[in-house]
């Protein structure tokens, strides 16, 4: 689909706050491609506390105000399930008998098996099914471009915008996520076991109240989790002075 053809439709944009989806909105704004609505799924730890890092939550809220000033409808939708609900799920038929009858706890977010990832996908799917959707695929993401269809398009691909270009596009409007400048390589949940050392140190220094919730997520397991998080010492890092891996 050409740029002129895109202008004949109204598009929904699933926005994450990251540079690719933000650049997509900016380019649509600059080139006059109609935006029906911008959808942001707010992943939630519980009914009131967002799962995103606080600095990211603040950025998202400020960016939403910019989009609304531009005249766009921004729909903020809470995730259809909270992290707390996953934490409190109980094992019933685990291949590890010692876990049955006990809470998922932090293991509900294990690498490759994170149950929260599907929650986000399903929330987005429930909102955008059948809509004309603008996707934040850059022109050099060749492994993704084949997924585009007549109703799922990328303005970046049409304009030849590469991933590296999105940084300057976002900076132009002061809409680049602060995570890039902070050296946080992923826009994930503050309790995610994939969190790198920089992110964990920032959380411990600035948000000890969230670290306490991570302690609770680990302790609620009530079974041996010594094999969990070995790659980046995630569990051990939060309990340097306490041996609770085998609780």
Model-derived regions: residue spans:
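ATP/NTP-dependent adenylation/nucleotidyl-transfer catalytic domains that generate, transfer
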Residues: 7-10, 176-178, 185-247
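Short gly/pro-enriched beta-turn/loop segments at secondary-structure junctions
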Residues: 128-130, 184-187
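ATP-dependent adenylation/nucleotidyltransferase module used to activate substrates
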Residues: 1-173
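Residue-level signal for mature regions of secreted extracellular proteins and peptides
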Residues: 107, 182-185
């Amino acid at each position: 689909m050409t740029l002129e053809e895109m202008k004949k439709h109204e598009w929904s944009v699933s926005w994450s706050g990251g540079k690719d989806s933000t650049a997509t909105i900016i380019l649509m704004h600059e080139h006059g491609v109609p935006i029906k609505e911008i959808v942001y799924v707010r992943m939630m730890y519980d009914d009131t506390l967002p799962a995103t890092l606080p600095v990211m939550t603040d950025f998202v809220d400020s960016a939403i105000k910019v989009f609304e000033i531009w005249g766009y409808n921004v729909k903020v939708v809470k995730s259809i399930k909270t992290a707390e609900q996953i934490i409190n799920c109980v094992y019933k038929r685990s291949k590890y008998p010692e876990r049955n009858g006990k809470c998922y706890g932090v293991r509900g977010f294990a690498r490759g098996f994170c149950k929260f990832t599907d929650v986000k996908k399903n929330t987005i799917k429930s909102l955008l099914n059948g809509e004309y959707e603008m996707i934040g695929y850059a022109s050099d993401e060749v492994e993704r471009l084949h997924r585009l269809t007549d109703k799922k398009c990328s303005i970046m691909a049409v304009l030849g915008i590469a991933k590296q270009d999105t940084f300057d596009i976002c900076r132009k409007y002061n809409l680049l996520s602060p995570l890039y400048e902070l050296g946080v390589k992923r826009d994930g949940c503050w309790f995610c076991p994939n969190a790198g050392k920089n992110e964990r140190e920032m959380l411990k220094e600035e948000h000890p109240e969230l670290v306490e919730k991570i302690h609770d997520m680990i302790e609620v397991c009530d079974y041996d989790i010594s094999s969990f998080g070995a790659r980046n010492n995630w569990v051990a890092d939060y309990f340097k002075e306490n041996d609770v891996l085998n609780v």
